[in-house]
Amino acid sequence: MSDKEAGVASSLGSNSPINKDEVDVKNTEEHSKQESKSDINKPPLKKIKADDGIDISDSFSRRENKGNNKVISSVYNDENKKTPAWMKSKTTDKYDKYGSRSTPIATPTAPVNNPDERYSKYMTNSVNSNDRVRRPPTETTSSQYDKKRAHDEAEDDVVAPYSNLAVANPSSNLYQTFQSHINNREGKDINSIVRSHYNQRTQQSKFQGSRTKSPIYKLRNFNNAIKYILLGNWVKPNPDSNRPTVILDLCCGKGGDLNKCEFVSVDQYIGIDISDASIKEAFSRYSRNKARFIPQTAESKKERDTRRYNFEACFATGDCFSSSIPEILEPNFPGIIDGLFPVDCVSLQFAMHYAFETEEKVHQLLTNVTKSLRAGGTLIGTIPSSDFIRDKIVNRAFIDQENRKFGNDLYSVTFHKDPPDEGVFRPPFGNGYNYSLKDAIDDVPEYVVPFEVFRGLCEEYGLVLKYKKNFIDIFNQEIPKYFSKLNKNLIEGMKRSDGKYGAEGLEKEAVGFYIGFVFEKLGN
């Protein structure tokens, strides 16, 4: 005990215990009095002004900042330290089969046109992008721009549907055929036009009325039957029974082929399309009809409910003619390339004619296809027939000679420039025309696909032709085998005026415009 504490204790009496709190309080009061006395004798503090030339930056910090503090090293900032094993990525080589992968670097937030080096093998460098066929932009002065701006800023993709018409009522017997509204077509590239067109089509289709009232109802059923036949004959299950059967649907649209994928009993579906509205509709369609329990064993798969989708599905928005498959899928579905690729089938329905705008796009598409397919896997597609187009040109079967247009009341093809008299297009890329199909496609630019050129390019990518026929021949030869397998409503929707089934009249010429094809990837 200190002398001071002893003195306090004695003043309280020898029998009184020392109260520590009381001692502390008294000591504190005494110390405060001494400080107040010393403060009186101190000179007043001098006020520091900004213009006194004194550095006061350190005065605002509570920490001692003498500039000689030792920096603690860390594995995050010491280059001499080795990265611990737990921090190393296990997937640094996950895209080696698609191409070399360099260390990612910081990129500016503004979009740039430089290709991602990680997917160099997925990209095609053989064609100069400056050679791309572009639509010449219209010359617009600043004053004209100001006048047009308010109108053009109305987004093409969200044109108001037929909500003000009686046809918006589901009980109405009226039907409104589809019409697109795309601003400034001449100043837009094909991607923008196609995206806007199909976004509008997706939105307006909800308000058109019953599809059975469509002027191309029978034609749609016919085309669907062709796709059932092609997929039914050529989707081959994975030879490894432990692997799922996977189909990659490029340019999948609104998911119109989901029923066909259930028909061929796939286990996994991957859909990609350039139209975000179409992708949303495809996902919605899948979600509404997905089976509650997905069969996982061979026995349960035999008892799958074909009225529901007994397969898993994922959807992504992307341009498979300009971007690699990993670039489109991996950001939204990490690990999907390792988990589901290579796939058993790539489906490309009514879309490849958009790629033939440039050779670069075709090479990118075929790179995506061959890198995605397993050996023995198939590429199944439908495209306009270059033979059909050539015959129309050679026979001068134009309904409008001046405008270079052929077709009928259901469909039409209008060339951008005079086609060659012999119907053979050289060079084979960028030979454009505008295609219209009543209630489906409204004057959208497409490009001639010279099939032998396409076939030669496929062979360069290890894809060999297995099947090629026009729609009429496919139907006549294959429909007897599928007549009892297809949905009754689909079959009845193809009934002709003579009681038989198939296409007739204007519809027959419109469906004759297309062919179906199948390529198989070579390899062991």
UniProtKB/Swiss-Prot annotation:
GO terms for cellular component: cytosol; nucleus. Gene3D superfamilies: Vaccinia Virus protein VP39. It catalyses: a 5'-end (5'-triphosphoguanosine)-ribonucleoside in mRNA + S-adenosyl-L-methionine = a 5'-end (N(7)-methyl 5'-triphosphoguanosine)-ribonucleoside in mRNA + S-adenosyl-L-homocysteine. Its EC number is 2.1.1.56. Responsible for methylating the 5'-cap structure of mRNAs. This is mRNA cap guanine-N(7) methyltransferase. The keyword Mitochondrion does not apply. InterPro entries: mRNA_G-N7_MeTrfase_dom, mRNA_G-N7_MeTrfase_euk, RG7MT1, SAM-dependent_MTases_sf. Residues 68-77, 100-112 have a biased composition (Polar residues). S-adenosyl-L-methionine binds at K227, C251, D273, D319, Q349, Y354. The record marks K254, K260, R285, H353, E446, Y514 as: mRNA cap binding. Pfam families: mRNA_G-N7_MeTrfase. Residues 214-522 form the mRNA cap 0 methyltransferase domain. Residues 1-155 are annotated as: Disordered. MRNA binds at N223, N224. It comes from Debaryomyces hansenii (strain ATCC 36239 / CBS 767 / BCRC 21394 / JCM 1990 / NBRC 0083 / IGC 2968) (Yeast). It is an enzyme of class 2 (transferase). One of its GO terms (molecular function) is RNA binding. The gene is ABD1. It is found in: Nucleus. Transmembrane segments: none annotated.
